[in-house]
Amino acid sequence: MNWPVRVLVVDDSAFSRRLVTDILQADPDIQVVGYARNGREALEKVASLQPRVVTLDQEMPVMDGLTTLTALMAGNPVAVIMLSSHTAAGAAVTIKALELGAVDFIPKPAPGDSLDDFTRQLTEKVKAAARVPVTRLCRGKNCRENTPAPFISPRPGREEAVAAVTGSAAATAAIGSRLSPGRSPGGKEGVAGAVSAGSTRGEAIRPGKGTPAAIKGAVAAGAGRLPGRRPGIEVVAIGTSTGGPAALRQVLTALPGNLPAGIVIVQHMPAGFTGPLARRLDELAALEVREAAAGDILRPGLALLAPAGRQMLLERHGDAVQVHLAAEAGITTLFKPSVDALFLTVAREYGPRSLGVILTGMGNDGLRGLRAIKEQGGTVIAQDEATSVVYGMPRAAVEAGLADLVLPLEDIAPAIVALVTGAG
């Protein structure tokens, strides 16, 4: 891409416009090409100035942030970073903005907050957003509706059959039977050995996109890389960062409410935003989704999202595995919550019964945890580059040779179901 990054600052507050402009202009890799005081001005200036990134306020006269974002994505897609408030209402609006196509967000500094932290985050996020290809930004009809075609209807009832994910019990059994020896959920003998030709250890499977046949074929081919006799998967651990809320929505809304495995999730977010994200995902998914609390017990059909500002760790007590929330994780990490911190305890408590999923995000958080999962005999799925908003965390896993499957986002939920239900 071309440097410096051209940025349009959109905010009705003169103070906020000046603060953001001064911070960005101090970086030689960033050029503020203009500002707008409301959404209508923003649409006009995006068309005339052609910025690469827009910083967008939520509450403005004439046209608010969400309305502006929707119009931008439908007509003139550009990387958008939302400047959000710390209020509960502001957090809910931010979650909606991420669904509608915003690349990332940053809370406006409150009195007493460190301007150094805000400066660092703002410049880092602007540069990261500038690297996102325009083809990955939400656009047109897909953005206005912004509802991925689910394999099941949103919240049809938490007893929805697992077979609905792939269309029929026979289809689910067919996928599962091709993953490992033994019996599939439908009682058929597995045939993994017959379909594993061409797969070598250390080489991730990369299927074609979009068709059930491609998904089934990829998962079946992946059996050649997986241990021949795996115990049933009991936990799905998901880690993500930039682009994660939209990715989580697509994955979780395509899973059945009675998935026979618990789910634990780390999404890098500041305090005050993980709760609203969990509530929004719970509204949309057939699974039960909630922000994790200390003492929560993992169970099938429940997805627990790590709270911001804490490390979510797992501890086994007898037959139950519980959530432990800690200030520190006993490892060196920049993040709270940390994907590595969670995944390391997943590997410890579940071993070969664990499935690690790494989605879009900056950096390499999760790499140590995925390595531990693999060393304990677990399985790893990584999102592919073409569908990742930022191909950092998945890339680290793929380049380290840890990914059993490298899949486009829309194929990850079917693969999870196939692996979980076909591993018995």
Swiss-Prot record:
Protein's name according to its UniProt entry: Protein-glutamate methylesterase/protein-glutamine glutaminase
Report which reactions are catalysed by this protein: [protein]-L-glutamate 5-O-methyl ester + H2O = L-glutamyl-[protein] + methanol + H(+); L-glutaminyl-[protein] + H2O = L-glutamyl-[protein] + NH4(+)
**Can you give the residue ranges of the Response regulatory domain?**
6-123
Per the record, the similarity remark reads: Belongs to the CheB family.
Instruction: Return the CDD domains for the record.
Output: CheB_Rec, REC_CheB-like
4-aspartylphosphate PTM positions read D57
Which gene holds the coding sequence for this protein? Answer: cheB
Q: Which residues form the signal peptide?
A: none
> What keywords is this UniProt entry annotated with?
Chemotaxis, Cytoplasm, Hydrolase, Phosphoprotein
Q: What's the entry's take on its domains?
A: Contains a C-terminal catalytic domain, and an N-terminal region which modulates catalytic activity.
Keyword Hydrolase, does the record have it? Answer: yes
* Pfam family for this entry, one: Response_reg
